[in-house]
């Protein structure tokens, strides 16, 4: 059974994903999948901001583990290892999600879709596969896999995103 969580400041957390035993169950993983994918497809900026606050810990981070080729080449040119790209906190996460929306969803070319339901990996870790699907013909323009670490309130503490090929 999913139960709501209330912080001492009396802010309701109705989207809590952990059960009374602090384990991720099928219902929690389904909810996580739906909310996470909805966030990246959401057209309304205020709704995106609200979803980020519901899904993510205040200091939550997303780490892009395999940055775009031009960034990898620039790092290699100055003898640096390939860098991870990290955004932290609700404001930076909002900017990251908004930019992805503007690039891929707003033009009407793609939509993000889950590749099944998130899977419990270990403890409070979940893995979520997704695809960027063409609205024109249903072809896959790209895929990814996110490893999400949830905090004690069931919000995302960290998200390590691995971008895959189409």
Show which residues each predicted segment covers.
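Short hydrophobic transmembrane-like helices used for membrane targeting/insertion
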Residues: 1-3, 11
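C-terminal and inter-domain tail/linker signature
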Residues: 5-7, 17-166
């Amino acid at each position: 059974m999913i139960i709501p969580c209330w912080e001492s400041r009396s802010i309701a957390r109705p989207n809590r994903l952990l059960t009374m035993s602090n384990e991720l169950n099928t219902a929690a993983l389904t909810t996580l999948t739906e909310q996470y994918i909805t966030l990246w497809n959401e057209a309304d900026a205020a709704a995106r901001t609200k979803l980020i606050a519901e899904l993510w810990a205040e200091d939550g981070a997303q780490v892009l583990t395999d940055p775009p080729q031009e960034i990898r080449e620039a790092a290699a040119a100055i003898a640096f290892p390939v860098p991870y790209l990290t955004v932290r906190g609700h404001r930076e996460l909002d900017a990251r999600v908004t930019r992805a929306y503007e690039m891929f969803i707003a033009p009407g070319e793609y939509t993000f879709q889950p590749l099944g339901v998130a899977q419990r990996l270990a403890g409070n870790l979940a893995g979520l596969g997704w695809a960027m699907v063409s609205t024109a013909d249903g072809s896959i323009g790209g895929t990814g896999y996110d490893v999400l670490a949830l905090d004690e309130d069931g919000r995302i503490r960290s998200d390590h995103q691995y971008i895959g090929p189409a």
